């Protein structure tokens, strides 16, 4: 079996229609990619030749250490040498990739509609959805009526005839004529929980099996589409807004789930379904104001009264993602 055939076999593990797209790309471009690897070109050089790297003017698109320099003993290529090296590779292999326009949105169009970090499927525009991924109920409480923007998790209402806040409590006690929402929830300090932050907030995770050749199989990618639609994040299993069991996402995740939301719900069932995770991969502290504008407690979104919310702001991943080795990033 050739290397190209072996890679095509891996493509077959992907769910439809991505298996066909992957196999097609490999059949077209696989031989040239493999030849470049055999010629010891680094991933950065290959990405530059293929054309999937973008960089600001005057910057070099690189992630890994530059290749070794032929001019310096035990040294790496300078920026100028690296750019010349890339130009040589383009001259040798560029024709093979001419016309290739790689756009992830062509593969996952729905996933590219979440740039504003709001639910993709939200008919009534209340920031809550009946669909799980794509910033839906995996991230925020599940909408119980996506055709009515006055019905959403976190609303402060007596719910006499309808469960307007989607916590499962509505109706009136026939013996006292008191709404159940008032009877059970009034005076209990019921509230929601929300968090604004980065990839650590969103619980970013690449399933290890995706990167382990010996574990590649159709089962490995059984949750592939959902994982991509959730940006490789697992907010439904996070420490802040976790509300699901890892067994539902096997084999990608295992172990117990515990969260602030689960503890608050355990202490007071009036808090059921009232959570929001606005964690974004690669976010910085400067994004927090923007994120706060899509928190459903914003009165500019709805004038209807809403319950209080316990709000966290967490930029936990900055130490990992920053390019600057400043003192606060050191273990000390």
What is the predicted role of each segment?
Residues 1-116:
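Extracellular/luminal segments of secreted precursors and ectodomains of membrane proteins
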Residues 5, 9, 31, 44, ...:
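Solvent-exposed, polar/charged alpha-helical surfaces in well-ordered, non-transmembrane soluble domains
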Residues 93-187, 192:
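Extracellular calcium-associated, cysteine-rich motifs in secreted modular proteins
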Residues 192-196, 311:
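Conserved beta-strand elements of the Class I
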Residues 196-212:
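Short, solvent-exposed beta-strand-terminating loops
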Residues 216-331:
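Conserved SGNH/GDSL esterase-like catalytic core that processes O-acyl groups on lipids
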């Amino acid at each position: 079996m050739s290397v190209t055939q072996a890679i095509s076999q891996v493509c077959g593990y992907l769910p439809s229609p991505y298996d066909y797209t992957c196999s097609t790309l490999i059949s077209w471009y696989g031989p040239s990619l493999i030849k470049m690897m055999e010629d010891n070109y680094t991933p950065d050089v290959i990405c530059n030749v293929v054309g999937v790297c973008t960089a600001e003017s005057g910057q070099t698109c690189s992630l890994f250490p530059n290749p070794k320099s032929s001019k310096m003993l035990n040294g790496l290529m300078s920026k100028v040498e690296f750019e010349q090296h890339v130009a040589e590779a383009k001259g040798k292999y560029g024709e093979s990739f001419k016309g290739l326009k790689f756009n992830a949105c062509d593969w996952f169009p729905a996933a590219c509609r979440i740039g504003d970090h709001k639910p993709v499927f939200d008919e009534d525009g209340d920031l809550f959805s009946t669909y799980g991924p794509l910033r839906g109920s995996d991230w925020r409480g599940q909408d119980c009526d996506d055709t009515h923007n006055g019905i959403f998790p976190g609303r402060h209402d007596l719910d006499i005839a309808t469960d307007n806040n989607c916590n499962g409590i509505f109706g009136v006690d026939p013996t006292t004529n008191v709404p159940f929402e008032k009877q059970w929830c009034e005076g209990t300090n019921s509230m929601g929980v929300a968090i604004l932050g980065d990839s650590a907030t969103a619980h970013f995770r690449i399933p290890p099996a995706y990167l382990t050749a010996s574990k590649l199989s159709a089962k490995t990618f059984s949750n592939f589409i959902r994982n991509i639609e959730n940006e490789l994040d697992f907010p439904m299993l996070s420490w802040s807004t976790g509300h699901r069991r890892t067994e539902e996402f096997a084999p990608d995740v295992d172990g117990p789930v515990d969260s602030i939301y689960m503890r608050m719900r355990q202490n007071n069932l009036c808090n059921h379904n009232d959570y929001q995770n606005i964690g974004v991969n690669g976010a910085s502290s400067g994004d927090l104001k923007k994120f706060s504008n899509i928190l459903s407690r914003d009165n500019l979104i709805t004038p209807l009264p809403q319950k209080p919310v316990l709000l966290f702001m967490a930029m936990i991943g900055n130490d990992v993602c920053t390019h600057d080795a400043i003192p606060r990033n050191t273990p000390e």
